């Protein structure tokens, strides 16, 4: 049965055409034929440049961006989407958005970590944004995976290098392998490429192992997690816990009232059509 998934990026996608094109090609490859992934980014003008990585390094700034993810989730549900995906490895507002929606909500980072645990005993994350490593370590603890987590480390190149790598990937892939082998030597038997721009570059170039160690396709992981949760909801009626402080669902009317009171609704997104 067909399904529609709202993809939410931390980037302004129209500012990054090479990345946007790479994502579209990869989603077409990994999603089921009857799954439609509709790509959405942050509001135009969110960042002073095409690079969001500086903001993502600071907890308080990341939290200030958070309402865009919550409002996108609300828009997804109200537009009839079957699932909502936060496609950014720090899983911005994942817990809060999951508590606020009835449709399945998946996170890029959580999906990658959970799938990594099915492929090996311990995983390590390689990022081009070094300032995010502390948050990823904290997320691993919050997801109950501290004993399976080796480290999150800087991969040895930058976002600009990744963008250039879309047209000339060979050198960047070799540099990634050097960093991966260091992580493997420290005990990782699964490697998670941190940010989605790096993940899609590696996946579109067929990099799924370094020597005998798997390299996670984190984008495919959240796609398959979303498809599975939609299937389980349809076939078995499974849905999230609504018990307690973190899982209790707030009244939608009050949520919208507060978003408007704090001036957030001017950034509320509109659903796009799939391509």
Could you say what each language-model-derived stretch is?
Residues 1-63, 128-167, 265-270, 275:
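N-terminal glycine-rich anion-binding loop in soluble enzyme alpha/beta folds
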Residues 6, 123-126, 189:
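Conserved beta-strand elements of the Class I
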Residues 8, 189, 194-201, 215-244:
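C-terminal and late-domain segments of enzyme folds
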Residues 56-75, 171-177:
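Glycine-rich, highly charged phosphate/nucleotide-binding loops
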Residues 63-101, 105-108, 189-201:
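N-terminal glycine-rich phosphate/adenylate-binding segment common to multiple enzyme folds
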Residues 96-120, 207-226:
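Short, acidic/small-residue loops that bind anionic groups at enzyme active sites
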Residues 118-154, 225-268:
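Short, glycine-/small-residue-rich phosphate/pyrophosphate-handling segment
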Residues 141-199, 203:
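Active-site rim beta-loop-alpha module in soluble metabolic enzymes
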């Amino acid at each position: 049965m067909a399904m529609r998934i709202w993809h939410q990026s931390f980037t302004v996608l129209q500012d990054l055409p090479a990345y946007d094109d790479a994502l579209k090609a990869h989603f077409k490859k990994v999603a089921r034929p009857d799954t439609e992934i509709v790509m959405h980014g942050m509001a135009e003008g969110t960042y002073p440049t095409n690079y969001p990585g500086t903001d993502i390094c600071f907890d308080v700034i990341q939290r200030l961006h958070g309402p865009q993810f919550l409002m996108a989730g609300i828009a997804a549900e109200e537009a009839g989407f079957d699932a909502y995906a936060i496609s950014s490895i720090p899983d911005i507002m994942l817990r809060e958005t999951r508590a606020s929606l009835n449709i399945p909500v998946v996170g890029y980072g959580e999906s990658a970590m959970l799938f990594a645990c099915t492929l090996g005993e311990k995983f390590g994350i390689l990022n081009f944004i070094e300032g995010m490593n502390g948050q990823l370590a904290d997320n691993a603890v919050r997801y109950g995976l501290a004993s399976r987590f080796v480290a999150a480390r800087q991969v040895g190149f930058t976002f600009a290098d990744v963008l250039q790598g879309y047209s000339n990937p060979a050198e960047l892939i070799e540099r990634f392998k050097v960093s991966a082998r260091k992580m493997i030597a420290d005990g990782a038997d699964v490697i998670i490429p941190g940010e989605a721009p790096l993940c899609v570059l590696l996946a579109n170039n067929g990099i799924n192992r370094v020597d005998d160690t798997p390299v996670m396709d984190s984008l495919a992981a959240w796609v398959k997690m979303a498809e599975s949760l939609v299937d389980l909801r349809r076939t078995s009626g499974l849905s999230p816990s609504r018990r307690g402080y973190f899982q209790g669902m707030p009244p939608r009317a009050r949520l919208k009232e507060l978003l408007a009171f704090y001036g957030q609704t001017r950034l509320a997104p509109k659903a796009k059509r799939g391509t």
